[in-house]
Regions:
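Core alpha/beta nucleotide-donor-binding catalytic domains of modification enzymes
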Residues: 1-174
Length: 177
C-alpha cells in the first residue's frame, strides 16, 4: 500500500478520546475507514449503521454491516429511521442521521465519518451553484462540533481512488449501491 496514503490520514485528531463511533453504511468509504481504524488503533470502536429503509435491499445492507463487524470483532449498533413521504428524502435522511448520531454517541466519545477529498470538492461546488455567500463556501474540515458531538474526518485529504486501492489491497467486501 502506498505510504503516501497513510501519511495523509490524520490520526492526531483522535488522540483525546478512548472510544470512537464510526458512521458505517457498508459502502467503500466507511468500510475502508472502519477497517483502517480497527487495524491501526488500540481503541474501542463502535460502528453505527443507520437503515434508512428506502431500498428493498436495506435489510441486506444492514446484515452485511453486522456480519462485517462480527468477522472483525467490532461492536455495531444498527438503527432504523423512518423518512416522512412528504419531505425531501436527502435532507430528511441527513437530519435523521444527525439526530440518531447525537442520541447514540456519548459526549466522552467522538463520531468518525469517512468524508474524503472528493466529498469536500462536491460540497464546495454544490454550495457555489446554490449561490451561497463567502462564508458558505467553506467546506467541512477534519474536525467539527455539532452541539456536544465532536465529529472527526481522518480521510478528508484522501482521494476516492486511494480508498478504492485500499479496499482492493485488503480484499474487503462492501455494499455496491
Amino acid at each position: 500500500m502506498d505510504k503516501h496514503f497513510f501519511s495523509k490520514i490524520n490520526l492526531d485528531i483522535i488522540s483525546d478520546t478512548k472510544e470512537l463511533y464510526i458512521g458505517y453504511s457498508g459502502g467503500p468509504d466507511s468500510t475502508a475507514l472502519l477497517h483502517y481504524l480497527n487495524s491501526n488503533l488500540d481503541i474501542k470502536l463502535t460502528a453505527v449503521h443507520i437503515n434508512h429503509g428506502i431500498s428493498d435491499r436495506s435489510k441486506n445492507w444492514e446484515k452485511h454491516c453486522s456480519d462485517f463487524c462480527k468477522q472483525n470483532k467490532i461492536n455495531i449498533i444498527c438503527e432504523s429511521i423512518k423518512i416522512e413521504k412528504n419531505k425531501s428524502i436527502e435532507s430528511e435522511a441527513r437530519r435523521l442521521r444527525i439526530e440518531t448520531f447525537k442520541n447514540i454517541v456519548p459526549t466522552s466519545a467522538h463520531l468518525v465519518l469517512a468524508h474524503h477529498l472528493g466529498d469536500r470538492v462536491e460540497t464546495l461546488l454544490y454550495r457555489l451553484f446554490r449561490g451561497t455567500g463567502i462564508k458558505g463556501l467553506s467546506t467541512f474540515s477534519d474536525q467539527a462540533k455539532l452541539g456536544t458531538l465532536k465529529i472527526i474526518r481522518p480521510f478528508i485529504k484522501i482521494e476516492k481512488s486511494e480508498i478504492l486501492n485500499y479496499l482492493n489491497e485488503y480484499n474487503l467486501s462492501l455494499i455496491h449501491i
